[in-house]
């Protein structure tokens, strides 16, 4: 049986968690992607909880049930701080349990920023389609996005198509009708924070020695699979597992064969807990 818990961080951000009645092998801090929220990972959480891994997720600033302009994360520093506070709270709820961070898309970038900084003691990290698109972080785009971020931070600059998240039409429909998702264009401030973080994080990858599982759908049109290849080539971890799912879209955990993906995640967690 899965128990749902929830609360707010010191920033006012909403967090939630899923726990179970099976022995705890480890605790997972889940970091969601842009324009969505932690509640979209209820099924992922149910699978991990059943395997002995309680899951905790925080809604980023401007996302889900957290305060802020919809779709505007404000600053990467504040977003990472929210992940850190939740990770510490989750750890205190399960003292002694190995801790893992699991980030998807923008959440993968946030997770990388966190784990290459000063995180809590971690046993490993899982990155799903991490938003590390180096080709987009060129000087011209960064300069333009920085100017827009300062002058018009809430301006919509890029439309993201929900049809590209999964081949499962029910998943796409649910995404479009979920009132907690933001369906507008990517905000200028959020875009600038993403590009700046991609650049700032790159030189820190070599020092990252944490065990990693990185996976990506080969048909992802939102974050190119080259992002996962870049991470795999530049991290310093000797314990690195990369999985590419042929023909899968952006959310491999929400594809028709999502249980196969989740089986792989559980197996990796079991091998590292």
PLM feature spans:
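Alpha/beta-hydrolase fold nucleophile elbow
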Residues: 94-104
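Conserved alpha/beta-hydrolase "acid-adjacent" motif
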Residues: 221-227
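Alpha/beta-hydrolase-fold enzymes
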Residues: 104-186
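Conserved alpha/beta-hydrolase
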Residues: 45-68
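Short beta-strand/loop motif that positions the catalytic acidic residue
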Residues: 208, 214-216, 220
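Active-site glycine-rich loops that stabilize anionic/oxyanionic intermediates
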Residues: 28, 33-36
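Catalytic active-site module of serine/aspartate enzymes centered on a nucleophile-bearing elbow/loop
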Residues: 241-273
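Catalytic nucleophile-loop/oxyanion-hole region of alpha/beta-hydrolase
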Residues: 35-38, 64-94, 261
């Amino acid at each position: 049986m899965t128990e749902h818990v929830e609360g707010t961080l010191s920033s006012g951000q909403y967090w939630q968690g899923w726990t179970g009645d099976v022995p705890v092998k480890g605790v997972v801090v889940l970091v969601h992607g842009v324009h969505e929220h932690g509640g979209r990972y209820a099924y992922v959480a149910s699978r991990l909880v059943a395997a002995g891994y309680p899951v905790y997720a925080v809604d980023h600033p401007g996302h889900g049930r957290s305060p802020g302009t919809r779709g505007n994360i404000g600053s990467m520093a504040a977003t990472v701080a929210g992940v850190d506070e939740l990770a510490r709270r989750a750890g205190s709820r399960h003292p002694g349990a190995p801790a893992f961070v699991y980030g998807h898309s923008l959440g993968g970038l946030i997770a990388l920023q966190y784990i290459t900084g000063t995180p809590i003691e971690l046993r490993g990290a899982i990155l799903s389609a991490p938003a590390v698109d180096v080709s987009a972080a060129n000087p011209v785009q960064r300069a333009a996005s920085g100017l827009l971020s300062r002058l018009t931070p809430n301006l919509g600059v890029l439309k993201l198509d929900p049809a590209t998240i999964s081949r499962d039409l029910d998943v796409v429909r649910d995404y479009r009708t979920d009132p907690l998702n933001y369906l507008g264009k990517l905000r200028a401030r959020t875009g600038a924070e993403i590009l700046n973080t991609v650049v700032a994080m790159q030189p820190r990858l070599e020092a990252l020695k944490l065990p990693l599982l990185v996976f990506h759908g080969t048909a992802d049109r939102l974050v190119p699979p080259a992002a996962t290849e870049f991470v795999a080539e530049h991290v310093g971890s000797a314990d690195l597992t990369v999985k590419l799912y042929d023909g899968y879209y952006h959310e491999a955990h929400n594809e028709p064969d999502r249980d196969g993906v989740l089986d792989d995640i559980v197996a990796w967690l079991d091998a590292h807990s």
